[in-house]
Design a protein with these regions (language model features):
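C-terminal capping alpha-helices of c-type cytochrome domains
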Residues: 76-100, 154-185
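Bacterial N-terminal signal peptides
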Residues: 11-21
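Short cysteine/histidine-rich metal-coordination sites, predominantly Zn2+-binding motifs
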Residues: 137-146
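Short acidic, glycine/proline-enriched loop segments that cap or flank alpha-helices
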Residues: 77-78, 128-137, 153-156
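The canonical Cys-X-X-Cys-His
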Residues: 44-49, 86, 118-129, 164, ...
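Electrostatic cytochrome c docking/interface patches
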Residues: 26-56, 70-78, 82, 88-116
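Acidic/histidine-rich, surface-exposed loop or edge segments in extracytoplasmic proteins
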Residues: 67-72, 123-127, 147
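Bacterial N-terminal signal peptides that target proteins for export
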Residues: 1-12
Length: 185
């Protein structure tokens, strides 16, 4: 790679970080987006979550239908879409590594969910509205997005990419009126 190309990439990265920091400083957050699996799990377990119960969930290996039965048995007020989002999150991300499970505050060690990944991964480079929030794709369509050269370079694990794809297929597109005006287009 030439020095000019390296400098250009560095400048682009600095600009993207500056835009992200500015948006955060302006008080914008992702609360307008449908909750992801991590947020739904913490809501389901209550505040603060019982560490023993959270640890048992973090160490469990279940299929997606088994996770669905597990969550449904809790008699929570989740919508069908939220139930699907949470069970997809659990199926993709559990069990967690032993090192993560041993942390004192396990809730903070939970893997990011699709909403977190979209907010931190898409917005720094391009409009979240045009690139994500208004797109309707099946899971494979979202996975295919990571095949493009610029998306292949994203620092996301295969697990994070799958989480993003599953969340996005279940929760996108959003209605235009549900997106804050400052984040449209």
């Amino acid at each position: 790679m030439t020095a000019a190309a390296s400098a250009g990439r560095l400048l682009l990265a600095v600009f993207a970080v500056a835009v992200f920091v500015f948006a955060q400083a302006a008080g914008e957050d992702n609360a307008f987006m449908p909750k992801g699996g991590r947020a739904l799990l913490l809501d389901l377990l209550g505040v603060p979550p019982d560490q023993t119960e959270l640890r048992a969930i973090a160490q469990a290996r279940r299929t997606e239908p088994e996770w669905r039965d597990f969550v449904a048995a809790r008699k929570s007020a989740l919508t069908e879409r939220e139930l699907a989002t949470l069970t997809a999150y659990l199926a993709v991300n559990m069990p967690m590594s032993e090192d993560a499970v041993k942390r004192g505050n396990l809730a903070s060690a939970l893997p990011p969910d699709g909403r977190d990944l979209a907010w931190s991964g898409c917005q720094p480079c391009h409009s979240l509205f045009a690139s994500h929030l208004t797109q309707r794709r099946q899971v494979q369509g979202w996975r295919n997005m990571f095949l493009s050269p610029f998306h292949r370079e994203l620092k996301m694990s295969p697990q994070e990419r799958e989480e993003f794809a599953r969340y996005s297929a279940l929760n996108m597109p959003m209605k235009i009126e549900d997106v804050p005006p400052d984040l449209r287009f």
